[in-house]
């Protein structure tokens, strides 16, 4: 079974290929050292693929240009593009992207033969996407494609400044691709007042009405909290009047600043809600523990990073032991190099004698921490394959019983009725292990330093997100404006 490469996968492959071939560049050698070079290059290659531009085509374009920076840039990019496709061909047996594979394989997929396909939310299509549409339409029972357009003034959309110019160009391309296309106009379900407001929005002199507009209410609030609180109170009023929570949608310009706020304030009003904001996993204790662990190893027992790791409660220490150890290290002036000296710590700071933190007790805690971290510290000290780094980290997770701890947390959350928290503990463990496995598949044999592996894994952890499901069938949906599928709700707060 073949899995499509994620954006993170592509960046890692391109980063490794760039590091191996830097000497072959003409002008991109300095740019290749920038942190976001792989991300920009990945986006450029994806764009080329979308428009059916191959590495060979880029090389041909560079060849006909006059001598200059652009010629050398295109040559370098075409070289990396070719290396990238060759790597995918060698490692995975095919350099095809998702759209290429879908266009070629659609005719072999049985369930498409009787399927009714709906394509919605597009204003234009790339050449590769048009190939996919053609392949699907050839085998499916019916293919319906929706485009936003003004049906009464369709020909006006040819103008360069027309609101629906891109959609009209897509319509003409589809008409050529599907000569037997049937055009239908979807009924406009918007309230007449909203429709008039929408249709005259870009007019030089907006239309005015003498009667109050009932379908649209505009309110002003001093800050986000007051804004969300007002929405919550209005929702309660609507529900008391007979509305269902599922009839109501809150649409925000950006999910991040509003999602947590809506969850907290709606909970105060006993309003069930579901936010489709993809929560990053870096806020989970396991992600924080791995980040702190790698920083501890990289910075040679950094005190700040070490105690961040210990305070995640994932290490086999009691919180009291962690606090006592931190208090001792601060009072005794313990530095990083004191951790890997052979002898026990001998100094007992004044004032700690009567706090139960005797030297035997403190050295016992220190030994447990050192014994757990030292194998990883030694493994990351030199250069090794990415596979061995991943194996060492996986072994550390096993030795620290991280999986068992998370399973216990999951069970406790389920017993307390916190299903969302329980799913988070389950998902984060599975996704971290999957990340390590994915890195081995992508570049397992690549030699690198411990610092390079730390950078790669840290970036991978930042890419992980929780996948959550609505807690109930009847709930208010909080989403961002980019997700237009929710705009059919009878009541919308923007």
Region roles according to the model:
Residues 1-494:
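Polyanion-engaging groove/track-forming segments
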């Amino acid at each position: 079974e073949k899995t499509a490469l994620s954006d993170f996968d592509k960046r890692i492959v391109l980063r490794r290929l760039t590091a191996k071939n830097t000497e072959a560049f003409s002008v991109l050698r300095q740019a290749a050292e920038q942190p976001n070079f792989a991300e920009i290059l990945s986006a450029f290659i994806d764009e080329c693929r979308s428009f059916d531009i191959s590495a060979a085509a880029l090389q041909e374009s560079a060849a006909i240009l006059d001598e200059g920076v652009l010629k050398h840039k295109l040559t370098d990019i075409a070289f990396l593009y070719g290396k990238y496709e060759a790597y995918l061909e060698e490692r995975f047996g095919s350099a095809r992207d998702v759209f290429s594979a879908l266009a070629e394989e659609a005719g072999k997929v049985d369930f498409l033969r009787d399927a009714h396909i709906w394509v919605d939310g597009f204003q234009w299509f790339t050449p590769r996407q048009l190939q996919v549409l053609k392949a699907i339409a050839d085998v499916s029972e019916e293919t319906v494609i929706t485009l936003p357009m003004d049906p009464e003034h369709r020909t006006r959309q040819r103008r360069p400044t027309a609101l629906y110019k891109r959609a009209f160009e897509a319509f003409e391309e589809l008409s050529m691709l599907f000569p037997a296309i049937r055009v239908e106009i979807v009924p406009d379900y918007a309230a007449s007042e909203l429709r008039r407001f929408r249709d005259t929005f870009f007019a030089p002199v907006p239309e005015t009405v003498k009667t109050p507009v009932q379908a649209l209410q505009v309110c002003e609030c001093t800050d986000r909290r007051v804004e969300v609180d007002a929405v919550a109170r209005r929702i309660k009023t609507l529900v008391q009047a007979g509305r269902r929570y599922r009839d109501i949608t809150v649409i925000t310009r950006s999910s991040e600043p509003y999602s947590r706020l809506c969850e907290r304030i709606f909970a105060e009003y006993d309003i069930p809600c579901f936010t489709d904001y993809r929560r990053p996993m870096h806020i989970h204790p396991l992600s924080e523990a791995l980040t702190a662990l790698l920083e501890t190893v990289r910075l040679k027992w950094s005190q700040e990073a070490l105690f961040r790791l210990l305070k995640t409660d994932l290490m086999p220490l009691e919180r009291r032991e962690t606090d006592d150890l931190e208090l001792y290290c601060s009072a005794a002036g313990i530095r990083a190099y004191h951790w890997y000296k052979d002898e026990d710590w001998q100094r007992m700071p004044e004032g700690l004698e009567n706090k139960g933190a005797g030297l035997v007790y403190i050295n016992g805690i220190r030994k447990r921490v050192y014994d757990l971290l030292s194998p990883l510290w030694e493994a990351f000290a030199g250069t090794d394959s990415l596979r061995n780094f991943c194996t060492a980290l996986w072994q550390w997770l096993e030795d620290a019983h991280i999986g068992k701890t998370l399973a216990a947390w999951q069970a406790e959350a389920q017993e307390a009725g916190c299903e969302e928290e329980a799913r988070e503990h389950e998902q984060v463990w599975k996704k971290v292990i999957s990340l390590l496995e994915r890195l081995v598949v992508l570049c397992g044999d690549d030699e690198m330093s411990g610092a390079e592996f730390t950078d790669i894994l840290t970036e991978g952890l930042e890419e992980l997100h929780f996948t959550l499901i609505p807690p109930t069938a009847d709930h208010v949906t909080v989403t961002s404006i980019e997700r237009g599928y929710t705009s059919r709700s009878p009541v919308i707060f923007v």
